[in-house]
Regions:
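Acidic, polar-rich low-complexity tracts and alpha-helical solenoid repeat scaffolds
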Residues: 2, 6-8, 18-345
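Alpha-helical oligomerization interfaces
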Residues: 12-16
Length: 345
């Protein structure tokens, strides 16, 4: 009985090792060298939204869209002939066909790299080039220069942001696609020298999308991950501005007002003179918004449907919180009037 158990265990171990070896072959699954950020990145796309690595499959109607040759070496040589003749579009199609048909071949990583290079440099299609360079990182991470390829990804993301997306000779702003491109860069190379700049771009693009709360998460996370850089100082000021934009929309929320004021106080203490001046001004605006909301709340009790005593209590609380506020004089005068009338209606 024990011998059977040992044999079964050995068989299972062999099978699992074989499966692992197959899955770890370049081109079959995300490579063992593929590096992803292990920490959470609030403000990025969620796990359900993120673009996950997906292996290329041979196309339908292979006799039309498939490889021209019968083996990867001949197919690669054919692609090089096309490149030499300047037929870059056809070369790109057949390089892609090689990777799809023979993903584990020794020619596949170089074919994938040449495909990405042609799309970027010859066909000038940054969107497709980004996808192909990302595929190179995900499936051939050990067969390529990982850091150099990640740098190219970041550069392409900048091109995509600057040029927009062309559809039928018209250019459109592709804010969401560009943001996701920058997120892909950070997730694949979180320690790159440009990672903080990429996060700044992501937060700014979140603002352009109208997602101020998500932008704040990115700014805050950037400051935590890269606390000593120039980007952290920039993020602090931008976060202050964005928090004020949110506060203007939700000014009736006293808790949010107080949280924003506390944040601005800390931000001012950590900023240089120029940024501090702006943040102090923003804090003054937040304090006036809080006072105005408290004043309107106090006036709510000063009506015919409420007793004078409830109005007096509300006004006294307002003066305790804002003794030197803009509305303090008006509140004191009304308070004296209510008390002069006996404090009851």
């Amino acid at each position: 009985m024990n011998a059977k158990i040992i044999v079964c265990a050995c068989t299972a171990a062999v099978i699992s090792s074989v499966v692992a070896a197959v899955l770890n072959q370049p081109g079959v699954g995300p490579g063992a060298g593929a590096r992803y950020a292990t920490d959470a990145y609030p403000g990025f796309d969620s796990e359900d939204e993120i673009v996950k690595p997906s292996r290329k499959e041979p196309r339908l109607f292979g006799w039309i869209n498939g490889p021209k040759k019968d083996d990867p070496a001949s197919q690669f040589a054919y692609c090089e002939e096309l490149i030499g003749d300047g037929d870059y579009s056809k070369a790109a199609r057949h390089l892609d066909a090689l990777v799809r048909e023979w993903p584990t071949s020794s020619q596949a990583p170089e074919a994938q790299l040449k495909l990405a290079e042609i799309l970027l440099d010859r066909l000038q299609d940054p969107d497709e080039a980004f996808s192909e360079y990302r595929y190179l990182l995900d499936f051939y991470s050990l067969q390529c220069d990982y850091n150099a390829t990640a740098d190219i990804l970041y550069r392409i993301a900048g091109i995509m942001r600057e040029e927009g997306k062309t559809i039928l000779f018209f250019r459109f702003r592709n804010t969401v696609d560009v943001r996701r491109a920058y997120e892909s860069c950070v997730l694949r190379a979180p320690g790159a020298v440009w990672a903080a700049d990429a996060m700044l771009a992501i937060a700014e693009l979140r603002e352009e999308e109208g997602k101020a709360l998500e932008a704040i998460k990115v700014y805050e996370n950037l400051r935590n991950i890269h606390p000593g850089g120039v980007q952290a100082k920039t993020a602090l000021l931008r976060e202050a501005r964005t928090r004020m934009e949110v506060l203007r929309e939700y000014g009736y929320n006293r808790s949010r007002c107080r949280d924003t004021i506390d944040f601005l106080e800390l931000a001012a203490a950590q900023s240089d003179a120029e940024a501090r001046e702006e943040i102090v001004r923003l804090r003054g605006q937040a304090e006036r918004m809080l006072e105005k909301e408290a004043f309107l709340a106090a006036k709510f009790y000063d009506s015919r449907t409420r007793t004078a005593r409830s109005a007096i209590n509300a006004y006294e609380k307002f003066l305790a919180d804002f003794p030197a506020g803009v509305h303090a004089g008006e509140v004191k005068a009304r308070l004296e009037e209510l008390k002069a009338n006996g404090g009851e209606k």
